């Protein structure tokens, strides 16, 4: 049964507040940053997260995420993404099997490469000027995701990024099919061209980006996009907000996001609430609501159990069009830089639209370096 239009967003907000009140002390994906009190830049070359992992990120993955570490030479520190002081490289491979069960249709099963990417970091002036490249090499033709110059003066207190990059907005989730990433249109498939200014303080991380609004689709006269995101970070919790305005002659889109993360014992929580308003000349405006609440339980070395609830109201002008999605994913890292994922997702949507009521099962192999 689908909850009422406003009940689910209210549940998400209450969950955000509730987690803040019940949080207790505790000794690429955002939950790892939340669990450890890190910023995105702690583990990634990109200050806003995603893509290539830096030396610390690779060392953390090897020593903290893997069930055991395998080294040919026990005295060796192992691979850390750095070729030398001037060059760093990395990559991600994801592939496996998926099965989609849509009511009144035959099952759709397939196996293959989900996504394969390579990263190159050229440190022209170490710790000050970097040229960064993120290229998707499969499936299909090669696709440039990020290509930018990064200037980090004052020991990284300020950041200036120019080129093509992922926009700063909401949680940097690995799953691009999450409602908050899919409906906002800001995810790993939609980089944009422009300039981003960043500020990194001990407890704050903030970014302001001015881009041309293409999201990988080519420039339009009179079109531009502005993105603003800020996060306040504490060792056991964080809260942030984002704003995005896509100014387009064919219709403007304005988006607001409230997001955060909390630790409650062994579980790291993530939550996000998005309000999206589309204004189309001649058709008026419509509001879209999307939410996510996710818990990650690292119940043993090398093991993580992820459970997610999501709600989507694709249009406040229509009734009975709400959708829900429930996900359970087990992630296992038997050795360093190798992860297996097995998951199930159940969609609960509009009775007359079978695709919004589908079930998905997947098994994935993730290799990174």
What residue ranges belong to the model's regions?
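Outer membrane beta-barrel
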Residues: 33, 51-53, 82-99, 105-213, ...
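The canonical Cys-X-X-Cys-His
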Residues: 38-47
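Outer-membrane beta-barrel "beta-signal"
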Residues: 39, 332, 357-369
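Hydrophobic, lipid-facing positions within transmembrane beta-strands of outer-membrane proteins
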Residues: 70-75, 87, 114-118, 145-147, ...
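Sequence/structural signature of outer-membrane beta-barrel proteins
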Residues: 96-103, 136-140, 167-171, 176, ...
